[in-house]
Amino acid sequence: MRHRKSGRQLNRNSSHRQAMFRNMAGSLVRHEIIKTTVAKAKELRRVVEPLITLAKSDSVANRRLAFARTRDAEVVGKLFTELGPRYQERPGGYTRILKCGLRAGDKAPMAYIELVGRPEAAQAVDVEAAE
């Protein structure tokens, strides 16, 4: 039975799921908005929000924790130099999910997940090809 087990399986084993969310978190930090399915967007919130909270206090230990979770030095740099200071006064809720219809191929519900307060110049990036 799966009583009280949190998180979605998304028809993947744990290593595939971990790698997928690591890649998606990196894409979201880099581009500040990505398009994905609603279920993946809701799960991605649980990965990205703690990373941004970690980036609010810049220390070597926190940078190492962020690197352990993302495995990307560029993403860690952006987290601690741009996103941490940007959300210093916000006590959580750094992402927004906007539903955007159904995917043409399989009618899966799609959504944009974006960082709140992002600069408007950032354009949406479709990460479905990467999956």
From Swiss-Prot:
GO terms for cellular component: cytosolic large ribosomal subunit. SUPFAM superfamilies: Prokaryotic ribosomal protein L17. It holds the Pfam family Ribosomal_L17. GO terms for biological process: translation. Keywords: Ribonucleoprotein, Ribosomal protein. InterPro entries: Ribosomal_bL17 (IPR000456), Ribosomal_bL17_CS (IPR047859), Ribosomal_bL17_sf (IPR036373). It comes from the Bacteria. One of its GO terms (molecular function) is structural constituent of ribosome. Part of the 50S ribosomal subunit. Contacts protein L32. HAMAP family: Ribosomal_bL17. Belongs to the bacterial ribosomal protein bL17 family. This is Large ribosomal subunit protein bL17. The gene is rplQ.
